[in-house]
């Protein structure tokens, strides 16, 4: 089986459906994301569904290093755009509402933040990261209205398709909430990108790979893959120090990502293939802080294995097991 010429042409030589390529084809130039942090929280932090937050989460891991507390959307965009323009001569940006749960507030307040971002010079779209259990109808309608006016991605933090894992990491929601959120978002014709963490204790290789055919069946538009990594001042750090958490080596993770991509519908956009936090707050693995090194290792391994996204789609993907959750949910996605 050879890498199809049609995909080589469409993906400009890459062996997966890269988000950067999609943005460049859409806007005819490189587009950069500017991460934003506002005064939001999460329902598994404030006591609504749990306390303490996810066991792996320290929001400093995705907060800009030069973040100023209580800085406005405009101020954060100015700072981010200035840095990207100086470094890359960037002209176009996506405002990325990234930290905490960016739909967990009153719709009027959310709209103010979103529209403030859209008013910033050079912003060509929005990315809104949230939890699947924090999309009330009013907020979803607001986001759908904005999506008619701008380029927009709704990013849903699922992290695992297995309820036993979601419970262990203290997510405070289940797969059923995610399925409901995806269905309602797709009813509004929204682009949905799902976050998935690979490497949780208790999940086998097959458990992790089962997410690819699961996403195929749901018809999501994008996926972000993260390797499990341990951040300072988290519950996961305590488990790691007790020897209760084993992490992938870079080679192990690279092989898993390629196996995952081979099962994934080639139409699904790969927004990210690995995750990393600032070196100063990363406990392990050390290789994860070298983002470019991890990405290059994936690119080289794809070439070495003569592999590509969707190589075994749909044949092997269709035969993969459904997630081990509720029976009626398994039936719903088959």
Task: Name these PLM-found stretches.
Residues 176-235, 251-276:
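Conserved C-terminal portion of the radical SAM core fold
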Residues 1-32, 222, 230-334:
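Auxiliary Fe-S-binding modules of radical SAM enzymes
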Residues 60-77, 84-107, 122-135, 151-177, ...:
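Core AdoMet radical
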Residues 1-94, 332-334:
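N-terminal [4Fe-4S]-dependent radical SAM core
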Residues 54, 116-123, 210-224, 294-309:
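Structural recognition of alpha->loop->beta junctions
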């Amino acid at each position: 089986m050879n890498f199809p010429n049609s995909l080589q042409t469409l993906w400009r030589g890459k062996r997966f459906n890269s988000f950067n390529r999609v943005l460049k084809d859409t806007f005819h130039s490189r587009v950069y994301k500017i991460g934003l942090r506002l005064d939001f929280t999460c329902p598994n932090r404030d006591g609504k569904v749990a306390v303490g937050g996810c066991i792996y989460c320290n929001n400093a891991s995705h907060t800009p290093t030069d973040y100023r507390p209580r800085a406005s959307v405009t101020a954060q965009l100015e700072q981010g755009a200035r840095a990207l323009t100086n470094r890359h001569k960037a002209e176009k940006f996506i405002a990325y509402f990234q930290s905490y749960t960016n739909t967990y507030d009153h719709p009027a307040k959310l709209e103010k933040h979103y529209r403030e971002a859209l008013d910033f010079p050079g912003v060509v779209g929005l990315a809104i990261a949230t939890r699947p259990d924090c999309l009330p109808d009013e907020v979803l309608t607001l986001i759908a209205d904005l999506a008619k006016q701008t380029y927009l991605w709704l990013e849903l933090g699922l992290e695992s398709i297995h309820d036993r894992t979601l419970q262990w990491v203290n997510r405070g929601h289940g797969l059923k909430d995610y399925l409901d959120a995806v269905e309602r978002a797709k009813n509004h014709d929204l682009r949905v990108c799902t976050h998935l963490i690979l490497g949780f204790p208790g999940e086998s290789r097959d458990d992790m790979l089962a997410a690819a055919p699961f996403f195929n069946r749901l018809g999501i538009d994008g996926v972000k893959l993260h390797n499990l990594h341990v951040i300072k001042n988290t519950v996961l750090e305590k488990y790691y120090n007790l020897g209760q958490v084993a992490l992938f080596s870079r080679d192990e993770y690279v092989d898993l990502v390629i196996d995952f991509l081979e099962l994934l519908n080639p139409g699904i956009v790969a927004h990210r293939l690995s995750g990393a936090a600032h070196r100063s707050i990363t406990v392990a693995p050390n290789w994860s802080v070298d983002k470019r090194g991890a990405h290059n290792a994936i690119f080289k391994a794809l070439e070495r294995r003569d592999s590509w996204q969707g190589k075994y789609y749909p044949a092997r993907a269709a035969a993969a097991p459904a997630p081990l959750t509720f029976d009626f949910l398994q039936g719903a996605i088959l």
